[in-house]
Design a protein with these regions (language model features):
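NTP-binding/hydrolysis catalytic cores, primarily Walker-type P-loop NTPases
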Residues: 51-122
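Conserved P-loop NTPase nucleotide-binding/switch module
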Residues: 1-66
C-alpha cells in the first residue's frame, strides 16, 4: 500500500480502501480491529531524492488503544542524516513469540537503543 508512514497507512489509506465497497458499512473501530488482528509488522519503504529506495521504518501493530485507535510502536527507524538504521528500544513481543513458535531464535539485543544497525541496502 502506498502511504507516507505506517500511521498514514493505518489511519488513512486502508480506511479509504474499505470505503470503495459501497455495500460495506464498517466503523473506524471495526476497521482498526481488523488491521490489528491481521497485521503484526509494517515495513515502510521510502524513495530518496537520488531515486534509491530504503527501508525507513519497521513498526509493530500492537492492538488498539482504549480510544479505538491502533497502537503502533516503531521498532527500527532510519536516520537520514547519519544514514543508519537504529533501534528505538521497543521490543515486538508478539512477533518474537510467533517467530520462536516456528523454531527460529531471536537475539533481542538488536532492539537495544543506541546500537546502530548497518545501513540496509535496497
Amino acid at each position: 500500500i502506498h502511504a507516507n508512514s505506517p500511521r498514514n497507512m493505518c489511519d488513512v489509506r486502508i480506511p479509504i480502501l474499505y470505503s470503495y465497497d459501497k455495500n460495506a458499512d464498517f466503523s473506524e473501530k471495526s476497521i482498526a480491529l481488523q488491521i490489528a488482528e491481521a497485521v503484526q509488522i509494517i515495513v515502510q519503504l521510502s524513495r530518496f531524492p537520488d531515486g534509491s529506495r530504503k527501508i525507513t521504518a519497521i513498526t509493530e501493530v500492537d492492538g488498539l488503544e482504549n480510544s479505538g485507535k491502533l497502537r503502533l510502536n516503531d521498532i527500527f527507524l532510519y536516520d537520514r542524516q547519519k544514514k543508519i538504521f537504529h533501534a528505538t528500544g521497543n521490543v515486538p513481543k508478539t512477533a518474537i513469540r510467533k517467530i520462536r513458535d516456528h523454531g527460529i531464535s531471536v537475539d533481542e539485543t538488536i532492539f537495544q537503543i543506541n546500537v546502530p544497525k548497518e545501513e540496509i541496502k535496497a
